[in-house]
Structures are given as structure tokens and as C-alpha cells.
């Protein structure tokens, strides 16, 4: 038997591994008898020994290909966090950060529920930056929150009274900002009825003179600026009708003379040239409406001069 097995091994081709897909190739290599043994499987122990001697391993067979023929029981896989302590610490830190970030938005809601709607608490959201207040110019009344505390009302009233009863030469730039900060809704929206850009100085006067050498502004005396109703009634406006109209008025009243002295007419030198004055024979010493030269007279004079002054032919 042993000699026959050896002869059979010698007849088989010597190769390390081969894949056989078709029956014809198997018949060519191993012959019909070997094919019968592959398909039917071993029947006796001697045949199994023969297969082992040949070194043939069937892929779909029930025989175990490993040398040990017992299943090895492996322990369960450990948790990946216990293997590396750094992974465990990083995971805990990430979870804590996430909880703290989400808890930041829940604490404000819990506080507002405990203390009720009377306590004004800022409700932050993800879309608004930190400590952000929106200034609204739409309305100065608190329409969103009708229930406001008595202390805030008292502060606003005292602030308005102070600004109205005690004016300063220059407006306080912080008054509007203080007022807007006091009037605030629960939705962190500042309702402002006035801003710094819209404030005006009520004490500004256009009759202010330039700065003196000492650096102080010198205003006109109150007597020069005061004007009574009698002065307005007795004041005669200038006209171009002639001296007859001016003689009809009553120049003897001291109030008229004092009031009219403030409004001096322009000098005649500013209205015409000396040539124009000689043409019309105007006496500059007289200061009456009849001596005044109108714009039409000036234009007419220059128009006549341009017509008469023609170039001479030599």
C-alpha cells in the first residue's frame, strides 16, 4: 500500500497551489480516479491519511485546516476608553463643554420662571452677541412690557425734570444716552426717543461776537437787544417815494429815534461809484429815502454810457 501511494504521488504534478474551476482541467491533471475521490470524499481512515500525504486541502470541507482542532475562546474586547486614559479624559472634557454651552441658554429661562415676569432678565440667544443692546427709534413708550416697576418711572421723571428746569449753556451729551438706557424692554431692546445727533442747543445765539483777546465771548448788552411793542408800531420803514412821505411821520418821538438808530442804512459808496454820484448829483450828507439810488438807475446809467462811448475812426 505504501509503495502504491508513493507511485501515485509521483504521478501527480508537483505544484504548491492551484485553483481548479472546470471538471475537464481536473481530469487532465489528476485523472478520473482522483476526481472521484475529491467529489465523493474520503470513506475510510486510510483515505484521509492519503489526502494528508498528498497535501490537498478542500476549501468547502468540514475538516478544520488549523493544526489544533479545538475552538479557541477569546476574551471579550475591552472598552477603548480603558486602553488609553487620554481618550477618556478628552471625551469627558468634550461632553462637559457641550453641557456647559447648552446650559448657558437654559439658566436664564429657569431664573425668569422662578422670579416671575416682574424681574427683568436678559434672555440671550445664539444670534445676538454678548451684551448687545439694540436701539430703536420707533417709539419712546414701553408697549411691549406694560407692567414696569415704580422705581424706573421715578428715575425717568426726575431725569426729565432736571434737564428741563436746569438748562446748561452746552447740552449734556450723556442725557440722551442715560434716558435711553433707563427706558429698556425685557427683550433687551432699548427704545430711544432722542439721540445725541438730534439734540440742539437752545441757548445758541447768532448775535455772538468773536472771541475777545482774553478768550471769553462778549455778548451784546440786553438793552440793545430788547425791543418793545411801541417801537415796532412807531417804526417807519424806508421807501423810495420821496421826502414828503418821511416828513408826514412823527420823528420827534425818542423811541423812534433810538430804535431807528440801530438800523443804519448802507453807505452810498458801497452802492455806486463817484462817477455815478456826480451824474445823479447825490448829496452824501443827506440820509433820506429820496437820495437812494435804485438798481434800475444804475443799470440805465451804464447802458447809456455804453451807447455813447463808440470807437472813433481815425
UniProtKB/Swiss-Prot annotation:
Its main location: other. Residues 140-156 have a biased composition (Basic and acidic residues). GO terms for cellular component: cell cortex; cellular bud neck; cellular bud tip; cytoplasm; cytoskeleton; incipient cellular bud site; mating projection tip; nucleus. PROSITE patterns: CRIB. It is found in: Bud neck; Bud tip; Cytoplasm, Cell cortex; Cytoplasm, Cytoskeleton. One of its GO terms (molecular function) is small GTPase binding. InterPro entries: CRIB_dom (IPR000095). GO terms for biological process: Cdc42 protein signal transduction; establishment of cell polarity; regulation of cell shape; regulation of exit from mitosis; septin ring organization. Residues 112-156, 199-221, 241-261 are annotated as: Disordered. Residues 251-260 have a biased composition (Low complexity). Residues 126-139 form the CRIB domain. Residues 208-221 have a biased composition (Polar residues). Keywords: Cell shape, Cytoplasm, Cytoskeleton. Belongs to the BORG/CEP family. Present with 1100 molecules/cell in log phase SD medium. Interacts with GTP-bound CDC42. Required for cell size and shape control, bud site selection, bud emergence, actin cytoskeletal organization, mitotic spindle orientation/positioning, and mating projection formation in response to mating pheromone. This is GTPase-interacting component 1. The lineage of its organism: Eukaryota, Fungi, Dikarya, Ascomycota, Saccharomycotina.
Amino acid at each position: 500500500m505504501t509503495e502504491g501511494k508513493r507511485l501515485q504521488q509521483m504521478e501527480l504534478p508537483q505544484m504548491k497551489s492551484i485553483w481548479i474551476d472546470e471538471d475537464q482541467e481536473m481530469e487532465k491533471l489528476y485523472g478520473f480516479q482522483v476526481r472521484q475521490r475529491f467529489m465523493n470524499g474520503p470513506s475510510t481512515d486510510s483515505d484521509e491519511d492519503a489526502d494528508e500525504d498528498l497535501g490537498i486541502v478542500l476549501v468547502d470541507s468540514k475538516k478544520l485546516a488549523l493544526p489544533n482542532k479545538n475552538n479557541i475562546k477569546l476574551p471579550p474586547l475591552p472598552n477603548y476608553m480603558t486602553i488609553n486614559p487620554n481618550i477618556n479624559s478628552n471625551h469627558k472634557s468634550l461632553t462637559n463643554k457641550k453641557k456647559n454651552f447648552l446650559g448657558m441658554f437654559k439658566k436664564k429661562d429657569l431664573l425668569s420662571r422662578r422670579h416671575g415676569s416682574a424681574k427683568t432678565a436678559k434672555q440671550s440667544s445664539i444670534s445676538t452677541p454678548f451684551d448687545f443692546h439694540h436701539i430703536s427709534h420707533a417709539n419712546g413708550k414701553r408697549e411691549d412690557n406694560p407692567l414696569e416697576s415704580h422705581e424706573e418711572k421715578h428715575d425717568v421723571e426726575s431725569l426729565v425734570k432736571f434737564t428741563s428746569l436746569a438748562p446748561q449753556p452746552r447740552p449734556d451729551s450723556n442725557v440722551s444716552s442715560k434716558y435711553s438706557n433707563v427706558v429698556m424692554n425685557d427683550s433687551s431692546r432699548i427704545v430711544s426717543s432722542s439721540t445725541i445727533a438730534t439734540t440742539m442747543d437752545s441757548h445758541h445765539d447768532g448775535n455772538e461776537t468773536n472771541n475777545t483777546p482774553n478768550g471769553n465771548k462778549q455778548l451784546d448788552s440786553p438793552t440793545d437787544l430788547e425791543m418793545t411793542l411801541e417801537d415796532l408800531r412807531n417804526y417807519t420803514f424806508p421807501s423810495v417815494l420821496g421826502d414828503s412821505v418821511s416828513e408826514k411821520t412823527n420823528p420827534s418821538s425818542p423811541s423812534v429815534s433810538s430804535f431807528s438808530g440801530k438800523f443804519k442804512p448802507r453807505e452810498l459808496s458801497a452802492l455806486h461809484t463817484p462817477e455815478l454820484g456826480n451824474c445823479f448829483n447825490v448829496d452824501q450828507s443827506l440820509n433820506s429815502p429820496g437820495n437812494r439810488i435804485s438798481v434800475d438807475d444804475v443799470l440805465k446809467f451804464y447802458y447809456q454810457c455804453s451807447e455813447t462811448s463808440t470807437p472813433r475812426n481815425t
